[in-house]
Amino acid sequence: MNLTIKHISKYKFSKNLSYGVQRLRLKPQNNKIQNINRWNINIQGGVEQFEYLDHHQNLCTFLTLNNDLKEIIISVDGQISTIESNGILGNDKPKTKPWMYKMYTPITKPGNHIKSFCKKWLDLSYSELDICHFVAYDIRKFVKFRKGSTSAYTSAEDSFKKKTGVCQDFTHIFISCLRFLGFSARYVSGYL
């Protein structure tokens, strides 16, 4: 499948910045299930300084922000070819141990609503992969995407109770459910 991605992030500051830095994780890499055909990033208000791989092997871009800056606009335009793999990349050879991704964070800690939602999968005899797919499918049926309905500080439980959220909320709910069910789960990156 060929995917065309156009993405714009705008950051507006309440007062002009005298100095700033920004780390971007907006450069996908080729792997077994995707090939990056074209990928362009345009930065208005900042200058790319260098790239590096973080502890998850994400390609990061380090920016410095222009002096006296009121707004930064980062736009991405790219095309990726993917191979259907049911969402499974395989062994990504993590540098961090899987047990690290079983721990809850304040954002992913499940409350009573998420725990109740997950109970039906606790004793099923399905494969682990099937359970992960069932959870993702049921979250998508239960929670509706609505721009502006949450913030970066909204917990998975709060978004789940509201039955609404944006990409990050779907991810946080999914991670919360999987960790409650005993899986190691972490956010990589991507689009919904």
Show where each model-derived region lies:
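Secondary-structure boundary elements
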Residues: 80, 84, 98-165, 173, ...
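Short alpha-helix boundary/capping motifs
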Residues: 9, 163-168
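Linear, non-domain "peripheral" regions
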Residues: 1-119, 183
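Short linear sequence elements within intrinsically disordered, low-complexity coil regions
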Residues: 16-18, 150, 175
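Hydrophobic/aromatic-rich core segments of domains that either
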Residues: 21, 137, 169-192
